[in-house]
Amino acid sequence: MIESKNQSFFPNRFDCVVVGAGHAGSEAAYISSKGGARTLLITMNLDTIGQMSCNPAIGGIAKGHMVREVDALGGIMGKMIDNTGIQFKMLNTSKGPSVWAPRAQAEKKEYQLKVKHTLEAEKNLSIRQDTVEELIIENDQVIGVRTGRGFEIFTNHVILTTGTFLSSLVHIGTYQNENGRMCEPTVKGLSKSLAKYNLKLGRLKTGTPPRIHKNSVDLSVLTIQEGDSNPSPFSFSTDKITRKQIPCFITYTNAETHKLIHENLNLSPMYSGQIQSTGPRYCPSIEDKVVRFADRERHQVFLEPEGYETSEIYLNGVSTSLPEEVQWKLVRSLKGLENAEIVRPGYAIEYDYVDPTELKPTLETKKIKGLYHAGQINGTTGYEEAAAQGLVAAYSVLHSLRNLTPLLFKRSESYIGVLIDDLVHKGVEDPYRMFTSRAEHRLLLRQDNADQRLMKYGYDLGLVDQKSYDCMKEKYERVNSVREKIYQIPLKPSDKFQNLLDQKGITNYKFGMKLDSFLKRPEIKIKDIEFMIPEVSSWSDLEKSILEMEIKYEGYIKRELETIQWKNKYLDLAIPEDINYEMIAGLKKEAIQKLKSHKPMTLEKASQISGVDPSDVDLILYHIKGKKKQEVEIF
């Protein structure tokens, strides 16, 4: 260790130290410094700040919702992808609006550099290349960190965002190496430091697919997948996406692929016993897919370009840790990839995590004051889940530094609230991934209204500027004003209206009925009736969507709000000891197993069991109260 007197020539005291510069660390460092805290970000490699370690994409089902929420709260992920995306799509538009979700392919290296440059521009943020090997604790309070090169940095607030680097081990067949990502060193000392203070550590596994050379693929025989013609931005501050979009492609596994995998399962670290830790349930390896879904004749594989100029293509759906020579055979068994060249092999990686039930809802550890965890160290998977946690941890630090009451995100107001509540109360048994099904109030948590739900918190901390906040308020004032007008406008005969009726094939209507009732018809969109409310013609697509959703689904929204109040009354409701969960129609098999094992005494305790979703708790409540689910079903 370098003596303190030799450290006087450089700053070694900060309000907050963030360890790790992935998606959790980048958000944490940005929010902390933007909020006025003198912040130090420590990363083992400045060139990998904000790196996309796995898929080159941001967003997706529920994940896109969280990116919008992070943006509304002042975070950077939404802005970064808007500036570096190469294909944008709104997913699930054929379903209800609660599950619509933005997703974008990224120009991978450009995204990483954009994050790095954004952080470098923050005046309250210092960035240093080093590792953190040990926490410095006194009287159960963190007072600093000790780095790999022996320097001591002092602070009362540390946010650990260590990703997959804690005592990590890479597997490719029988090959093993102590890496945190392929060819990047692991960090062992920090795991020992955490265990020293009796934080409960566990072991998880994740994986990544091989990358192939674009010029070795016959794209002409593959199914093309284009982006949206009018793409939706992630950030509420982005007016329009103008970047050139490029396509992705789709192929499928086949009988030859599956035969090859079965013949080599004994060489897979997950099936040979080499890997003992648990992998992500909802993002299985191709080996797991073939074994678990043996009745499936094929599995979809997306070919996702990693940028405009690079030749690398990401094979989404073929995560594997089979030996490299088997990976070549596997990839070349796919249509269009018969001559494919692998430039990076797929691999599995095991790493330490800390049981998230060790945390408060602020993401501060219960045992060590001032120590916060965010990202994969909490047992989650995904860039978006990590970014959300990094933001929450930094919010908590800012509230602590300002002696403010901690901000606790509610399940009823955000997916971030669902994420944090699930982690700290239920813990994890496998890497946690967010889904819309985890949110019981998802119709209220649409991706289009994240700013209305959350921006006030960012504004209060100075993380959202006055102009952005005023624009948000003015937007919803416009929406509310026109919505009230629509309630009053009667349908009247006109040539334009008759043309609309003829176009839609509508005959069952009455003149005099109000416009809101007409808009609630499934075949009618807000764009169809703009001639009756001309003021909306200048609105953004997002504003029009909000207006349409709030009118079309106002009955469901009202019932959802009533349901929140109704359910809150029954959290302490006792569950009968003799309840037969197998007799409750619709209850998931996993939930039945967990409920029978844990034997919760109340609905609240049932809701805190990992694997028991809000919809399962609803079914139990309806069963106990003797109500039929369809009588109170939430949209």
Curated annotation (Swiss-Prot):
GO terms for cellular component: cytosol. The keyword RNA-binding does not apply. PROSITE patterns: GIDA_1 (PS01280). SUPFAM superfamilies: FAD/NAD(P)-binding domain (SSF51905). It is found in: Cytoplasm. FAD binds at G20, A21, G22, H23, A24, G25. Its cofactor is FAD. SMART domains: GIDA_assoc_3. GO terms for molecular function: flavin adenine dinucleotide binding. GO terms for biological process: tRNA methylation; tRNA wobble uridine modification. It comes from the Bacteria. Its main location: cytoplasm. InterPro entries: FAD/NAD-bd_sf (IPR036188), GIDA_C_N (IPR049312), MnmG (IPR004416), MnmG-rel (IPR002218), MnmG-rel_CS (IPR020595), MnmG_C (IPR026904), MnmG_C_subdom (IPR047001), MnmG_C_subdom_sf (IPR044920). Belongs to the MnmG family. Homodimer. Heterotetramer of two MnmE and two MnmG subunits. This is tRNA uridine 5-carboxymethylaminomethyl modification enzyme MnmG. It comes from Leptospira interrogans serogroup Icterohaemorrhagiae serovar copenhageni (strain Fiocruz L1-130).
